[in-house]
Design a protein with these regions (language model features):
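Class I SAM-dependent methyltransferase Rossmann-like catalytic core
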Residues: 2-45
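A conserved beta-strand element that flanks and buttresses the S-adenosyl-L-methionine
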Residues: 111, 115
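Short glycine-centered segments of the SAM/dcSAM-binding site in methyltransferase folds
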Residues: 51, 145-148
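Core SAM-dependent methyltransferase catalytic element
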Residues: 200-202, 216-240
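Class I SAM-dependent methyltransferase SAM/SAH-binding core
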Residues: 53-100
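C-terminal alpha-helical "lid/dimerization" subdomain adjacent to the S-adenosyl-L-methionine
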Residues: 151-216
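A short acidic, Gly/Pro-enriched loop at the edge of an enzyme's catalytic core
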Residues: 98-110
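A short glycine-rich, Lys/Arg-flanked "PGG" loop and its adjoining helix->strand segment in the class I
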Residues: 128-144
Length: 240
């Protein structure tokens, strides 16, 4: 999901804004079997949360908001005026994953779900810098001993060089109708993502979420058996 601006290219920001405003992803997340499994896994992980900061929410809850006493969901195109559309324990706010303005050290859990592959810049190499910054921003909002919960789609390490090489033409395609309005994205191998998180937090859990028959690929339903992309859940803790 979208959620940053400083390290993202203007095209990435605008395409993310337009895509998620149309709620294409949210429609698929509500009905595809893989997303049902992901929602169950994330809901279980968040059970008993007090104050949850959901960064890059995109207007889509990858969990049952009732599991937390308070939820603050932020993204670039969300606005506080939208809060009445959601459960009473949910507050909606405009927010940037790379430049959060929420108070430091005030949340026991920060969730960043399917955010990182959207944090693309003009070059493929910008993604790593953006993700590292997003993790740092999330860490700052955690109280001592708080947890960062990451849900992310990752590719096999062997395909990462190819994906990076294909990123420039993918950016060009994102300017056309061929991607259906979906922004150019770039997924990391799970080992690289774990390494970026471990630079700043202590990883306590890293598991693959089993997929069903269908996933979303560039926002469209796609057979899971035909894509190398897999969903991972990582839980990391800030020092007490």
């Amino acid at each position: 999901m979208p959620g940053s601006s400083q390290g993202q290219s203007p095209l990435s920001v605008e395409r993310n804004r337009e895509f998620f405003a149309r709620d294409v992803y949210g429609h698929n997340a509500d009905r595809l079997d893989s997303h049902v499994r992901i929602r169950a896994a994330v809901t279980a992980e968040l059970a008993g949360t007090g104050r949850l900061l959901d960064v890059g929410n995109g207007g889509v809850f990858e969990y049952d908001p009732a599991v937390a006493e308070q939820v603050l969901a932020c993204d670039l195109f969300l606005d506080e005026s939208m809060s009445p559309e959601y459960p009473d324990n949910v507050t909606i706010a405009r927010g940037d994953a790379l430049d959060l303005h929420e108070e430091l050290g005030t949340h026991d859990v920060v969730l960043e779900a399917f955010l990182y592959h959207h944090l693309t810049g003009r070059r493929a190499s910008d993604s790593v810098d953006n993700i590292r910054r997003a993790i740092g921003q999330a860490k700052g909002r955690l109280e001592p001993g708080g947890r960062l919960v990451v849900v992310e789609s990752c590719i096999p390490a062997a395909l990462y060089p190819l994906e990076r090489a294909l990123y420039p033409p993918l950016q060009l395609l994102a300017r056309t109708r061929l991607l259906g309005g979906h922004p150019a994205t770039l997924q990391l191998p799970i080992a690289l993502l774990r390494r970026l998180i471990a630079e700043q937090l202590t990883i306590e859990k890293s598991v693959r979420i089993p997929l069903g028959r269908w996933v979303t690929q560039f926002g469209r339903p796609f057979p899971a058996a035909l894509t190398p992309v897999r969903a991972h859940l990582i839980v990391a803790r800030k020092a007490s």
